[in-house]
UniProtKB/Swiss-Prot annotation:
Pathway: Porphyrin-containing compound metabolism; protoporphyrin-IX biosynthesis; 5-aminolevulinate from L-glutamyl-tRNA(Glu): step 2/2. HAMAP family: HemL_aminotrans_3. It is an enzyme of class 5 (isomerase). This is Glutamate-1-semialdehyde 2,1-aminomutase.
Length: 426
């Protein structure tokens, strides 16, 4: 930290105040994983974030995924400012929600109709209710280590901060609810077949690429096999593309793998860094939402103009393709350099502009594997990188992201810092 600028003191003072005001000092648990206390960020631009003390970090967290264009891109900021001048909440429909829905539907193959909500959590919660209402079945099949937000129907064997803090199955969830959730390991079709065979599963819900236990990829045949099995047993297939939507491909993981679900949940990127979620899918299914059907969903801030315009502006940039070229190149280069530099046992799971490194293990294909990785070594890796002003997720069970702002100079600077840190840890 920069001496003379009270770096630790400033953040420490804020942390002391936060602990008096918030449970655990934070409003989302993974933020407390930075030790000995979080640094407080004042602003972000491009690939960088700046703390309240003025310290500059290269950012590979990117708000945990939404900021595929980097921080505060001018094209998005300009549109948001224009909308702020007009107003930001009306309690009525706006043409912006139609524009964003059209953009999403034009790129996400299965998105015939859409219901906007306010977060990924709300999206999966609504999608589960929708699947149950449509199918007239009560059970949901989910996969160990998949994280679908902080609500009762998915906080069973959950990844992300739920794993970091050892509350993969949260207190406060009635046993009656837990009995409606069936669990399989990711990449295990035999388990899926057994669970679906009773024909009481409303839907299989999963991240097509796991991003909340580190990055874990579907093995060849897993997604296609899952699609076939759900059809055979008359269960719906829900892809949670809150992370992968508009990141892996402009059409999401479903476009990349050419496997199309009945329902898709979206968030993060489609709001350009503002709160958003969406449930998309076949028209005959989405039309079960009120007021067209009897599956209730509502929200004061659903389709609010600011999130809509930020999403439109972001997707307009993504349609130019350059963001994917830059972000994917940055990720690929960093992974190649990590493979060259690391001499200890490890594996790196990588796709597009997202990756994660697992130490002490040579293969990670599911949640059980991810939990066997050397978490303590990862924490040391994270802490040493922080000293070099590089910010990667403080938890092993998150994803390292790159963006269109991670140009060659940023990546080269990062590689120099990686070499130093890995040398010190060797």
């Amino acid at each position: 930290m920069d001496k003379g600028r009270c770096t630790i003191l400033n953040s420490e003072e804020l942390w002391a105040q936060a602990r008096q005001l918030f449970a655990g000092g934070v409003n989302s648990p993974v933020r407390a994983a930075v030790k000995p206390f979080p640094f407080y960020v004042e602003r972000g631009k491009g690939a960088y974030i700046y703390t309240v003390e003025g310290n500059k970090f290269i950012d590979y967290v990117l708000g945990y995924g939404p900021l595929i264009l980097g921080h505060s891109p001018e094209s998005v900021k300009r549109k948001i400012i224009e909308q702020l001048e007009k107003g930001w909440l009306f309690g009525t429909p706006s043409k912006l929600e139609i524009e964003l829905a059209k953009k999403i539907s034009s790129h996400i193959p299965s998105a015939q109709k859409i219901r906007f909500v306010n977060s990924g959590t709300e999206a999966t919660m609504a999608a589960i209710r929708l699947a149950r209402g449509y199918s007239k079945r009560s059970k949901i099949l989910k996969f160990s280590g998949n994280y679908h937000g902080a609500h009762d129907y998915t906080l069973v064997e959950a990844g992300s901060a739920a794993t970091e803090y050892n509350v993969t199955t949260s207190d406060g969830i009635p046993m009656e609810i837990m009995k409606t959730i069936e669990i399989c390991e990711f990449n295990d079709l035999d388990c899926v077949d057994k669970k679906l065979r009773n024909e009481d599963i409303a839907a299989a819900l999963l991240e097509p690429i796991m991003g909340n236990a580190g990055v874990i990829l579907p093995e060849k045949g897993f997604l296609s096999g899952l699609r076939e099995l759900t059809k055979s047993y008359n269960s719906l297939l829900i892809f949670d593309e809150v992370i992968t939507g508009f990141r892996i491909d402009i059409g999401g993981a479903q476009s990349y793998y050419q496997i199309y679900p009945d329902i898709t949940t979206l968030g993060k990127i489609i709001g350009g860094g503002f709160p958003i979620g969406a449930v998309a899918g076949k028209a005959e299914i989405i039309d079960n939402f009120t007021p067209a059907g009897r599956v209730f969903n509502a929200g004061t801030f659903n389709a609010n103009p600011i999130s809509m315009i930020a999403g439109i502006a972001t997707i307009e940039e993504l349609e130019k393709e350059y963001p994917y070229n830059i972000a994917n190149k940055a990720s690929k280069t960093l992974v190649e350099e990590l493979e060259r530099l690391l001499k200890i046992k490890h594996t790196i799971n990588h796709i597009g502009s997202m990756f994660q490194v697992f130490f002490g293990i040579d293969k990670v294909r599911n949640y059980s594997d991810a939990k066997r990785a050397n978490k303590e070594y990862y924490i040391k890796f994270h802490e040493r990188l922080l000293k070099e002003r590089v910010f990667i997720p403080p938890s092993q069970y998150e994803t390292i992201f790159t963006s269109a702002a991670h140009e060659d100079d940023v990546v080269n600077d990062t590689i120099d810092k990686l070499a130093k840190v890995i040398g010190e840890l060797s």
